[in-house]
């Protein structure tokens, strides 16, 4: 039995030094809903956000299923190899709403080609892009 109703759901795993603080950010600032939350800040939390999940957990050393991998928060938040990208219908409205809730954007939304975008950081320094496609409604990339 699985908690996933579809064949596949894309989730994003976030390593946090303070799971409770991150849970509050992803629920109270970004508007997600905690669907699984541990009793203590050291336990995993799942936040439903848009049509996906954010999995928040503390870092840690290798385990038997990832024997060479150590999970940690970004040592330098300005050097990034991967980040969460949230697509929205109205970036100006999201920018205003999330700013009012305490999100600290790096810049206001800016036009870049066929999208407007801006960036925020979560409490552990992980980068999050917020973007709005400015292509015609219903446009999809070719398959």
Protein language model regions, located:
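Conserved beta-strand-loop-alpha-helix junction that forms the acyl-donor binding cleft
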Residues: 13-19
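Vicinal oxygen chelate
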Residues: 1-11, 33-86, 93-121, 133-143
């Amino acid at each position: 039995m699985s908690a996933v109703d579809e064949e596949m759901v894309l989730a994003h795993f976030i390593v946090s030094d303070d799971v409770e603080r991150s849970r509050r950010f992803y629920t109270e600032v970004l508007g997600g809903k905690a669907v699984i939350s541990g009793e203590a800040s050291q336990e995993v939390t799942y936040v439903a956000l848009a049509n996906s999940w954010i999995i928040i957990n503390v870092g840690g050393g290798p385990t038997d299923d990832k024997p060479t991998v150590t999970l940690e928060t970004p040592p330098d938040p300005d050097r990034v190899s991967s980040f969460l990208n949230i697509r929205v219908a109205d970036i100006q409205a999201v920018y205003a709403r999330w700013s009012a809730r305490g999100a600290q954007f790096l810049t206001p939304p800016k036009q870049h080609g066929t999208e407007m975008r801006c960036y925020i950081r979560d409490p552990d320094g992980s980068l999050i892009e917020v973007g709005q496609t400015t292509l015609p409604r219903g446009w999809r990339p070719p398959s």
